Amino acid sequence: MSIAATPEPPYTAVIFTSLRTDGDHGYDVMSARMEELAAQQPGYLGMESARERLGITVSYWVDDAAAAGWKQVAEHLVGQTRGQQAWYRDYEVRVATVTRAYGHPQGPRGSSPK
């Protein structure tokens, strides 16, 4: 996993925060498939994900319309339903517009705020 190389702002970030249920129940396979499928969608910029007890996945999109398009992809809708039924005790989705981004000098964008 690496830090997503995003363009200059503005762009859209979809933040998915979750608490899992016990057991895999096919989660790992579906998670890998969703990451692969998202990368094929128009307007996809990248994704970052981390999980311990609390999982956080941030996907980046060129705009709100691209993010909304991903939400409606048929296979993603199946994953959403399965998540509600079997994988998540709790989750929250937040959609935000990134207006400024900066990082470590050795990262993809340098250290200066943009």
How would you describe each model-predicted region?
Residues 1-54, 64-71, 88-114:
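Short S/T/G/P-rich N-terminal loop/turn motif that feeds into the first structured element of a domain
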